[in-house]
Regions:
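Hydrophobic membrane-insertion alpha-helices, especially the h-region
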Residues: 1-15
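Solvent-exposed, polar/charged alpha-helical surfaces in well-ordered, non-transmembrane soluble domains
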Residues: 36-40, 49, 53, 84, ...
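Solvent-exposed loop/turn segments at secondary-structure junctions
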Residues: 60-63, 82-85, 137-142
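A short, structured beta-strand-centered segment in the mid-to-C-terminal lobe
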Residues: 95-105
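Inter-helical turn/loop segments and adjacent helix faces that build the functional surface
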Residues: 120-127, 152
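Catalytic and substrate-binding regions of cell-wall glycan-acting enzymes that process beta-1,4-linked
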Residues: 130-187
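Substrate-binding/active-site groove segments that recognize
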Residues: 70-93, 108-114
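Export/targeting segments at the very N-terminus of extracytoplasmic proteins
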Residues: 14-64, 69, 87, 104, ...
Length: 187
């Protein structure tokens, strides 16, 4: 029994967020409630569902009613500007930003935006850190941090250029969570 407990503690620490991991073990339904929807929406946008779930984990801890400090809404903390771009691009009439509190709408808008960012950085050998920085801080800042270099820049070099500590931590925490999901083989 002690070995089992030690194993759980080890996995919790390894996750990068032991408190969250313990909560996930104690209440798996809360943390898996949107997995099916994440799989569907991620597939529509050719993204790994584990990456999308890692973004949801970081942005809202799976709270579809979360309000951000700058007006972000829902599971993926989508901004009104990004949501309006998504609605316009997808010809969604009568879109209202409060619809972002609907998990499906939020995941569709957020995943669309993330996919667009990944596509923007597809020439990089690992576009994910670049796309996450763009998702968090905007395209112009991510471009500046890449030094406007179209050639392949390492993720490590790029992250060193990120002069917003909160954005650097944001990217690193999502990548850590994404790798955690990959290591355990499930979301």
């Amino acid at each position: 029994m002690l070995a089992l407990a030690a194993g759980f503690v080890y996995l919790a620490v390894l996750s990068g967020d032991p408190v969250y991991t313990v909560y996930e073990w104690m209440s798996p339904a809360r943390f898996q409630r949107y997995d099916r929807l994440i799989h569907i929406v991620a597939a529509e946008h050719q993204l790994d569902p584990m990456l999308v779930k890692a973004v949801v984990w970081r942005e809202s801890r799976f709270d579809p009613e979360k309000h951000g400090s700058r007006g972000e809404r829902g599971l993926m903390q989508v901004t009104e500007k990004a949501a309006n771009e998504w609605a316009r691009e997808n010809k969604i009439a009568d879109f209202h930003p409060d619809q972002l509190f609907d998990p499906k709408t939020n995941l569709e808008a957020g995943t669309w935006y993330l996919h667009r960012a990944v596509e923007h950085w597809k020439l990089q050998s690992d576009p994910v850190p670049f796309a996450l920085a763009e998702y968090n801080a905007g395209a112009s800042r991510a471009q500046r941090w890449s030094k406007n270099d179209a050639t392949d820049t390492s993720a490590r070099t790029f992250l060193k250029n990120v002069d917003f500590p909160a954005t650097r931590k944001y990217v690193e925490s999502i990548i850590d969570r994404y790798e955690f999901y990959q290591r355990r083989g499930r979301m």
